[in-house]
């Protein structure tokens, strides 16, 4: 079952309106977050463990308030959505290859011990790595022409759980022996990071004739970059099972990085940064927390960057109405009556999100996601305006408004491309809507992962940047949650001066920046959801300055 109007954010997903077919739009501490929640389908069992036949049986014993919430959801969601058999379609066929240049076994890495400064022995790399292996293929740059630099591709395998994550690494064009390493993540959830590679910030793009076009403003100009297809069953990644929450995905990413840097210690000594957009506003705080939770690690994490992310729904959802109604710097998309309707819906939405924050329960978080997205994203989406860029209409609803996504998919489905990269699945999809839906019904969408950020700020800098023409994860909401975040530096951050962002030698600014302590917020002008696509030169400028530590706490 594909939910009929889910929103996928190339980085964020939800169900904005179930009544009609529209454009697809893509805890207090880490220990609490790790506890997670059972997927909704797994909760449809009775006391004896027998599957519940339908949602009516699940209501037995619930409070009247909870039942009332779900009565509303039933009006929006087809009964089939709650049928566990519909939750996971058959995965694409995969064929294991054996012509790898390197295979790194997690069990071997886990056996390595070293002596600490005080003389005690400890494992060289913490974490449960025994079930993981990393396969590495040296990519011949001449075969694809994407870039001339050294490249590696391959899979992280979790053999115990039949999970295989695909990655593609590009060395820096400049000084790879000293330049930092960046992990790039798209969101969805369920969208491939190879869309970020070819649509936004990688060494090349793909034109309508499926030809490779060089990108002079690639993020690997001054950094080595890893593009990772995660969670499983996204892009070239595959599994016989599925991942439906952010916490589970974090364990896989930690294992991948640990084994990759073990195989390539020359990169492990460099500074490492995690960057991403949209639903990566969920992923990155969790992934960074997972890495930082391991004292003995070979991942030299120095900062995180989140672009147009969804991180604090309670704060961010308050700013859909202003953005849609002319308060975000662009003309109003909705009329006065629609804006009033959004005003009327907001208190209920905020109450539901607060319920989710307080309880962490699937039964609270799923209604919050569906109601709020229907009430606050749905009206905008039904206008046909691009949810990723308020400046224009959605021109290609079959490709998340961007025809280039279709060209990228066609290119990556060519057999010679898949062979050159060592791909094991039969084909490529830019976004997997099964994963999109499963994360929604896991209750993952409204989880308060922003609560992880204060502890991250104690150790490393955090950059939140936002293109000012995006609707779905708009700059107003991102600015608001950075100012609302409870952390020791809140007062100083909120009163920090706002400065112009300019290219060297330029008279006109391309954005604004505010920084205090380890926290930085940027507004980037004339850019939608995908800032590097809309403003390639400017995004490379702030990336290089960020990696150089310009706004880090001194």
From Swiss-Prot:
Family of this protein: Belongs to the peptidase S10 family.
Look up keyword Transmembrane helix and say if it applies.
Answer: no
Summarizing the function annotation, the protein's role is:
Vacuolar carboxypeptidase involved in degradation of small peptides. Digests preferentially peptides containing an aliphatic or hydrophobic residue in P1' position, as well as methionine, leucine or phenylalanine in P1 position of ester substrate.
Entry's EC annotation: 3.4.16.5
Q: Where is the signal peptide?
A: 1-17
Origin organism is Podospora anserina (strain S / ATCC MYA-4624 / DSM 980 / FGSC 10383)
Query: What is the top-level taxon of the source organism?
Result: Eukaryota
- Location of the active site: 278, 470, 529
Q: Could you tell me what this protein is called?
A: Carboxypeptidase Y homolog A
Cellular localisation:
Vacuole
An example GO BP is: proteolysis
Q: Name where it mostly resides.
A: other
Pfam families according to UniProt: Carbpep_Y_N (PF05388), Peptidase_S10 (PF00450)
What PANTHER family does UniProt report for this protein, alphabetically? Answer: SERINE CARBOXYPEPTIDASE CTSA-4.1, SERINE PROTEASE FAMILY S10 SERINE CARBOXYPEPTIDASE
Q: Which reaction does it catalyse?
A: Release of a C-terminal amino acid with broad specificity
What top-level class of enzyme does the UniProt entry assign? hydrolase
- Keywords tagged on the record: Carboxypeptidase, Disulfide bond, Glycoprotein, Hydrolase, Protease, Signal, Vacuole, Zymogen
Q: Fetch the InterPro entries from UniProt.
A: AB_hydrolase_fold (IPR029058), Peptidase_S10 (IPR001563), Propeptide_carboxypepY (IPR008442), Ser_caboxypep_ser_AS (IPR018202)
Q: Which cysteines are joined by disulfide bonds?
A: 191-431, 325-339, 349-372, 356-365, 394-401
In this protein, the residues bearing a glycan are 222, 518
Molecular function per GO: serine-type carboxypeptidase activity
GO cellular component, alphabetical, reads: fungal-type vacuole
Q: Which residues form the propeptide?
A: 18-137
């Amino acid at each position: 079952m594909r939910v009929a109007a889910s929103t996928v954010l190339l980085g964020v997903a939800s169900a904005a309106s179930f009544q009609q077919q529209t454009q697809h739009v893509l805890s207090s501490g880490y220990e609490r977050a790790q506890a997670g929640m059972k997927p909704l389908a797994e909760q449809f069992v009775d006391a004896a463990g027998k599957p519940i036949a339908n949602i009516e049986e699940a209501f037995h014993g619930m409070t009247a308030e909870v039942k009332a919430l779900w009565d509303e959801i039933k009006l929006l969601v087809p009964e089939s959505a709650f049928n566990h058999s519909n939750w996971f379609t058959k995965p694409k066929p995969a064929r294991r290859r054996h012509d790898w240049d390197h295979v790194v076994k997690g069990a071997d890495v886990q056996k390595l011990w070293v002596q600490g400064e005080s003389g005690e022995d400890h494992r060289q790399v913490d974490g449960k790595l025994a079930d993981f292996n990393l396969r590495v293929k040296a990519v011949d740059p001449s075969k694809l022409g994407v870039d001339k630099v050294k490249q590696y591709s391959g899979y992280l395998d979790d053999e115990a759980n039949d999970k295989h994550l695909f990655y593609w690494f590009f060395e820096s064009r400049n000084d790879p022996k000293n330049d930092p390493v960046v992990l790039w993540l798209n969101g969805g959830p369920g969208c491939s990071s190879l869309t970020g590679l070819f649509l936004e910030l990688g060494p090349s793009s793909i034109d309508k004739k499926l030809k490779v076009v060089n990108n002079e403003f690639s993020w690997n100009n001054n950094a080595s970059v890893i593009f990772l297809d995660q969670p499983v069953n996204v892009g070239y990644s595959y599994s016989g099972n599925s991942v439906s929450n952010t916490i589970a995905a974090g364990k896989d990413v930690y294992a991948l990085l640990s084994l990759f840097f073990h195989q390539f210690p020359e990169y492990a000594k460099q500074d490492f940064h995690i960057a991403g957009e949209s639903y990566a506003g969920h992923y990155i705080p969790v992934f960074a927390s997972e890495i930082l939770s391991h004292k003995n690690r070979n991942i030299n994490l120095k900062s995180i960057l989140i672009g147009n992310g969804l991180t604090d729904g309670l704060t961010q959802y308050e700013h859909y109405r202003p953005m849609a109604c002319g308060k975000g710097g662009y003309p109003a998309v909705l009329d006065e009556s629609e804006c009033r309707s959004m005003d009327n819906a907001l208190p209920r939405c905020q109450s539901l999100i607060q319920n989710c924050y307080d309880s962490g329960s699937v039964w609270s978080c799923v209604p919050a996601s569906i109601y709020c997205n229907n009430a606050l994203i749905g009206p905008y989406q039904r206008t046909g305006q691009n949810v990723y860029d308020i400046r224009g209409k959605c021109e290609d609803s079959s490709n998340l408004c961007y025809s280039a996504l279709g060209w990228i998919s066609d290119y990556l489905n060519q057999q010679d491309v898949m062979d050159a990269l060592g791909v094991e699945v039969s084909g490529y999809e830019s976004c997997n809507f099964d994963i999109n839906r499963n994360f929604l019904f896991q209750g993952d969408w409204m989880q308060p992962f922003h609560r992880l950020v204060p502890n991250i700020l104690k150790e490393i800098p955090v950059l939140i940047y936002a293109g000012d023409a995006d609707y779905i994860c708009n700059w107003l909401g991102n600015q608001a949650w950075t100012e609302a975040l409870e952390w020791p530096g809140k007062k100083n951050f909120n009163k920090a001066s706002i400065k112009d962002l300019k290219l060297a030698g330029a008279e006109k600014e391309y954005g604004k920046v505010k920084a205090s302590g380890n926290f930085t917020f940027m507004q980037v002008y004339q850019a939608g959801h995908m800032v590097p696509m809309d403003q390639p030169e400017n995004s490379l400028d702030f990336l290089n300055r960020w990696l150089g530590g310009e706004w880090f706490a001194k």
